[in-house]
């Protein structure tokens, strides 16, 4: 069923730019999916990692090719290869524009795609991208102590974003950065900060840098 649903989404959502459509209307322009104007990293990155997971699960390397091609297009339109910054969105309707907001979600999924594609193809570009993506997150999302300070709400989809970053950061450490202890130390520092800020019930939420409140009802996505 995973293959069935992925194929349906990919066939319906791939645009003439080689990017995945974010919406069939609104800021993405006309309804015609194949010539829609917009795309977001929050759609492309997850599609890439999903394709890699399907390739691993099924043995069908065509899914790696899907991930590779989509990654190349996201890299072209939604990424700065000089500093590892993953852009939020791109649009050409009614004129070319970018949203340069960086999020733990988008850095995380593009990092995951880079790691998995490197593991399969061995192309040094993915290795170099992965390091820059990881370094951008450390250098731009953290406070002076090196702990992540962004995406720490309790009322939106931001609640779970850091979990996506840490999922693929862990994979980066294990698969690529095992010879550089600074990345593991960074991960451990953030884990300890979050854990030490749990409340008396053992609940910790996505605001790792402050004590989890005793009376607030936290979303399952963010706790």
Residue ranges and their predicted role:
Residues 28-33, 88-98, 142-152:
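Acidic/His metal-coordination segments adjacent to aromatic residues that form catalytic metal sites
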Residues 1-12, 59-77, 122-140, 178-197:
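Extended, well-ordered alpha-helical scaffold segments
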Residues 50-55, 63-114:
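Active-site cradle of extracellular carbohydrate-active enzymes
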Residues 1, 46-60, 109-122, 164-179:
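Well-ordered alpha-helical scaffold segments within catalytic/enzyme domains
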Residues 18, 39, 132-223:
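CBM-like carbohydrate-recognition segments
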Residues 1-54, 64-65:
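Extended ligand-binding groove/face enriched in aromatic
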């Amino acid at each position: 069923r995973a293959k069935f649903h992925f194929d349906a989404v990919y066939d319906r959502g791939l645009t003439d730019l080689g990017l995945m459509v974010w919406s069939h209307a609104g800021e993405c322009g006309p309804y015609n999916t194949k010539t829609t104007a917009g795309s977001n990293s929050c759609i492309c990155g997850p599609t890439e990692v999903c394709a890699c997971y399907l390739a691993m699960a099924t043995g069908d390397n065509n899914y790696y090719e899907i991930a590779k091609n989509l990654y190349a297009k996201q890299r072209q339109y939604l990424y700065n290869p000089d500093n590892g910054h993953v852009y939020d969105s791109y649009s050409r309707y009614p004129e070319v524009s970018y949203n340069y907001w960086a999020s733990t979600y988008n850095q995380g999924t593009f990092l995951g795609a880079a790691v998995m594609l490197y593991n399969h193809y061995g192309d040094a570009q993915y290795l170099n991208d992965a390091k820059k993506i990881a370094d951008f997150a450390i250098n731009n999302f953290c406070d002076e102590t090196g702990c992540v300070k962004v995406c720490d709400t309790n009322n939106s989809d931001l609640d779970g974003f850091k979990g996506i970053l840490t999922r693929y950061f862990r994979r980066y450490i294990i698969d690529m950065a095992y010879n550089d202890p600074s990345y593991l130390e960074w991960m451990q520092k953030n884990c300890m900060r979050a854990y030490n800020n749990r409340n008396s019930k053992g609940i910790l939420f996505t605001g790792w840098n402050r004590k989890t409140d005793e009376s607030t009802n936290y979303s399952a996505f963010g706790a």
